[in-house]
């Protein structure tokens, strides 16, 4: 298995509480519950690293290999209201399991997939 190093920019949330629920359910062998969450995640934009150390949900602006030439994104050209609307749409399928308590944020991070 080859590892891929990626860089992502997302307008959304770190869904730490949801990630912990998934890890706890998996450790308790409640696989049906975990599968239900994954089914809903598949209806959303999300990024989960290979070790499942973090989970981000929202409007994915950019997600590329760190060796690729990513598109240039100018902060002053971002329509935050539109991205917020899209971010909230992305969490709609997950509301049975998790709801954010804060507004979405612009988050940049690197991860391994």
Name the predicted role of every residue range.
Residues 108-110:
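Short, low-complexity polar/charged micro-motifs in intrinsically disordered terminal tails
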Residues 1-103, 112-113:
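Acidic (Asp/Glu-rich) sequence patches and key acidic residues
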